[in-house]
């Protein structure tokens, strides 16, 4: 039906007769000469019909936007002065010889000026995907997947599929459950990741595994979260953490070079503790020049308990950021930032405008300046590198609250004031704690319970689990976690110890992980791996703000599909066959 794509018609085929198929992007009638902007997934080309083809021209007057058509025409150079440099096909046009309407279109339910809500776009996703920018994102994603496969194939990784119907295991989020018809009262779970199966593949001698795989998590959604998402999943045997990071970094560097012509350079490594101390986040955005500074030593003796209290508490922190040019912020702006930090548990926000550094205490403006002496202010200005016109923002509370609140404030203020540099800043974050405390006094793994500790015996780990550092690593780019992984536990006694630390009884461990504990008995090799979020990676590379823009048929923020009206109620007969009943008040049933 066609000899080439619309977006591929260039001066190279001048004078040739070609056939194209696609959709009408725009129709213009200029006094008997009909111009059609014809679109397919490759781009747009201009076709015109004139008096030399009266039948086709008459038909061209009847077409409207989104009619699906086929044309035969002659490729010509555009007249001088009519070249459109904004189009890849802007140097040519096609003299239409024949026109066939393959299918007509009713008026679109989407606004042609693209003033559509996300709900509308998802309801008519098949129309939304016709938009050139959406088509380009889908093509870009396909090329990223293709590159990843080629790279890993060349590195002798095996593409091995793992089960979708599997066993529910605790991995941090709720599982999507699938009732079994043949095993009454039992359920499969959709995998949150192929974690255990890829470890079993290493125990099977596969050596190097990868998979571009769907994963499922029943959790609250954000702009970068979906109930079903795609991972680039990797696992290796006989590689240490540095080797896994090296090969993963090489893949991402080459991907950015091929797809965006961007040189990412080498990735620096930063410990988890340093990232929290300097940036208040375990995924720091290095495009922002200013960072957090600890000033508790300056505030221990001030007569202002908001500062001196946390300054004298070993579990608390007093930290500041110095925002370049921030003195121009109004009191209203500052109050809004004060409300913002309360989201993260902070009680408020103290501030200090730097009018004239050379004057020390006299050169600053702040409600808390009266509690500070000349020596403290001078050291504060030196430590933060403050300049005239800056503003210093304070956080004083429990360490985790200050890090999270001031770290988030750093990002927000930088975005609001245009202080985020237009560049790519990658890094590795390493040396994460093995565990984090729960409110009930227990512990939970910071990553997952299959991550190995660094340099500890079983006895040493059980004696002080809170102090254990995991052999884990996250790749971060521009404040976004691209992927994460770890060296895995490959000895049964260490894995059993982790379960004990997590208060998982022997019976529960056998029920949920018996197959893993059994497999670890039979010469399991040292192994390590990681997984990248493909959706998030493509989102970053295409410069959009939501992974819904790079997924063909995504869910809404409420985990629903407006296009198909999923989820939907099931037929009672089907539920009966599955031995499943729907209850009006599940909380009441659970309590009973």
Swiss-Prot record:
Gene3D superfamilies referenced in this protein's UniProt entry, alphabetically: Bira Bifunctional Protein, Domain 2, GAD-like domain, Nucleic acid-binding proteins
InterPro entries to which the protein is assigned, alphabetical: Aa-tRNA-synt_II (IPR004364), aa-tRNA-synth_II (IPR006195), aa-tRNA-synth_II/BPL/LPL (IPR045864), Asp-tRNA-ligase_1 (IPR004524), Asp-tRNA-ligase_1_N (IPR047089), Asp/Asn-tRNA-synth_IIb (IPR002312), AspRS_core (IPR047090), GAD-like_sf (IPR004115)
Binding positions for L-aspartate per the UniProt entry: 171, 217, 447, 488
Site label Important for tRNA non-discrimination, positions: 81
One GO molecular-function entry: aspartate-tRNA(Asn) ligase activity
Alphabetized UniProt keyword annotations: Aminoacyl-tRNA synthetase, ATP-binding, Cytoplasm, Ligase, Nucleotide-binding, Protein biosynthesis
Catalytic activity, EC: 6.1.1.23
Keyword DNA-binding: no
Alphabetical GO biological process terms: aspartyl-tRNA aminoacylation
Enzyme class: ligase
An annotated GO cellular component: cytoplasm
Family: Belongs to the class-II aminoacyl-tRNA synthetase family. Type 1 subfamily.
Protein name as it appears in the record: Aspartate--tRNA(Asp/Asn) ligase
Species annotation: Psychromonas ingrahamii (strain DSM 17664 / CCUG 51855 / 37)
